[in-house]
Amino acid sequence: DELITSKDFRSVTFDSLMPKIFARYPIEFVSAKSVDRRFFQNLHSQFETLKRILSTDFSALGIDRRKAMVEPSFICEALGLQGRLDFLQVENGLCGIELKAGRPPYPENDLSKVSFPHRAQCALYQSMIQSVLGVKLENQHFYLLYSRNLNPEGCLRPVKTSTRELQKLLNLRNKIVSVERDISRYG
């Protein structure tokens, strides 16, 4: 969040950020079993990846972090969906980014590959934005950001959603809700 919201993200350092992260998530750090040197090396690597993306990839794609919201929440009663998107820029063309702390699907150098659950999540966000903000799918630019990708050019991957894909996802969601309702009713 601080890289996006600071006046100058270049001045934010990993060392200055760590005490703030510890203060915000003390229970998570104390209870985690795998917080060791390697954990912090991975965290530092992801931090540097995010800084690089902000300085190079964002400007190349016309994304302006200063015109963005961090973690806006959406509730869409019409679709029965809710969620919190990691990054949303509304001005100068709508752009949404969902951050994933893991690696993209194999092979990592195939920049068209995104995980199906991650793609579905972005598609549902796009559907909510269309419903809530009135921005048509074709006017939305969505990306998955895999911060542990080994290929620097492949961290930010576009996700385009079609109306047909959204219909399939919503139908699947409706079937799940129907089964859950039946289980709660009939056991």
Language model features with spans:
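Metal-dependent nuclease catalytic cores that hydrolyze phosphodiester bonds in DNA/RNA
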Residues: 1-90
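Mg2+/Mn2+-dependent nuclease catalytic core
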Residues: 63-178
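Helicase P-loop NTPase motor core of nucleic-acid translocases
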Residues: 184-187
